[in-house]
């Protein structure tokens, strides 16, 4: 799972879809000003989906992702942007780790999956200067 080749990584996570104990994850994005549906990573066998959309009209961007890890799998996620914090996606059980670098924003993701998401990492870029 990585930034699509040739795309602008800044709007990478326009829309995040997470299912179950994070059985699958999907990132829709914008390429050359056009919305693109990302690929689903993992297995989509759960009946519910949780979405998190970024609002680019107010320059919303992801600052961090808190991950819950247990039994070899990502159990849940909480996304923090420069404007708000998401509700729990998945389950808030297990050991936590946070994808975050001070003074930077998340512009893409990478990871691995088996039956569920087993690892998640992030690509970072400097924050844009305030206008």
From Swiss-Prot:
GO molecular function: carbohydrate binding
Pfam families tied to this protein: Jacalin (PF01419)
Record-stated family: Belongs to the jacalin lectin family.
Annotated source species: Arabidopsis thaliana
GO biological process: defense response to virus
Gene3D superfamilies: Jacalin-like lectin domain
Domain of life: Eukaryota
Disulfide-bonded cysteines: none
Signal peptide: none
Keywords per UniProt: Lectin
Protein name: Jacalin-related lectin 15
Location of the Jacalin-type lectin domain: 1-126
Expression sites by tissue: Expressed in the vascular and surrounding tissues in cotyledons. Detected in root apical meristems.
InterPro entries referenced in this protein's UniProt entry, alphabetically: Jacalin-like_lectin_dom (IPR001229), Jacalin-like_lectin_dom_plant (IPR033734), Jacalin-like_lectin_dom_sf (IPR036404)
